[in-house]
UniProtKB/Swiss-Prot annotation:
GO terms for cellular component: SNARE complex. Residues 198-260 form the t-SNARE coiled-coil homology domain. It comes from Arabidopsis thaliana (Mouse-ear cress). This is Putative SNAP25 homologous protein SNAP30. The lineage of its organism: Eukaryota, Viridiplantae, Streptophyta, Embryophyta, Tracheophyta. It is a peripheral membrane protein.
């Protein structure tokens, strides 16, 4: 009537494609056939951490949610094993450095005692000279020696036979130190939750095997440290006795020298 009406066949939606030869209409809204970008639900971790306590518990979850939860727990367990392994590796590194420092300390004790032996030789020559300086009419002087200076009791550290046998036994049992395990073949990319869980279990087995090896190494290190400390304690006691003997003889030599100078 007013000239505003058109035939229904000529109506077009605003978003209709101009190149649409099939006559179909493309609506402005998204259709169910178009792909939808799925963004991760950042609340999943919170749900998994509290065991679905806020959503009815495990019994109320779908099979898909339970599969995701199983994968999540498997990955968390793998992370825990890897963290323990990293801590154990750091402890082993610190233990190796400590053991090396102990060996160096033992070598220093050995060198110090060898210097005491050299001092004994020099002191013996000095005592002989002081005795000769008295002259033929003076009373002969003889230094007081309560013990001989025998030198160090320990030698540069060598692996003990017991340690070597222990190492051989561990290697026969397949427990020798070997770092991170690489025995597992490369696994294909998992296609479902079960395969992902099995893959994580394989990683956990490798990590636990490596952790067992490291703990064995730490036990051996602890035994070696204990043996080294015991040897050094005995060596220090022996060195202290020799130093006391040298100190007593030096005091006697000083008294003899002052007596000769007072004449």
């Amino acid at each position: 009537m007013f000239g505003f009406f058109k035939s229904p066949g000529n109506n077009k939606l605003p978003n209709e494609s101009s190149n649409n030869k099939g006559g179909t209409i493309t609506a402005g809204r998204r259709t169910s056939s178009e792909p939808i970008l799925i963004t991760p639900d950042f609340d999943d971790d919170d749900k998994y951490k509290n065991g679905f306590n806020d959503s009815g518990g495990l019994q109320s979850q779908t099979t898909e949610e339970l599969e995701k939860y199983a994968v999540y727990k498997a990955e968390e367990t793998t992370k825990g094993v890897n963290n323990c392994l990293k801590i154990a590796e750091d402890i082993r590194s610190d233990g190796a450095r400590t053991l090396e420092m102990l060996h160096q300390q033992g070598e220093q004790i050995n060198r110090t005692h060898e210097m005491a032996v050299d001092m004994d030789k020099d002191l013996s020559r000095g005592e002989k000279l002081l005795n000769n300086l008295g002259g033929m009419f003076s009373k002969p002087w003889k230094p007081k020696k309560t013990k001989n200076i025998t030198g160090p009791m320990i030698t540069p550290d060598k692996p003990s036979k017991k340690s070597e046998n222990h190492k051989e036994e561990r290697e026969k049992l397949g427990l020798g130190a070997k770092g991170r395990s690489s025995s597992q073949p490369a696994l294909d990319q998992p296609t479902n939750a079960l395969q992902k869980v099995e893959q994580e279990k394989a990683k956990q087995d490798d990590g636990l095997s490596d952790l067992s090896d490291i703990l064995g190494d730490l036990k051996s290190m602890a035994v070696d440290m204990g043996s080294e400390i015991d040897k050094q304690n005995k060596a220090l006691d022996h060195l202290g006795d020799d130093v006391d003997e040298l100190n007593s003889r030096v005091q006697g030599a000083n008294q003899r020298a002052r007596h000769l100078l007072s004449k």
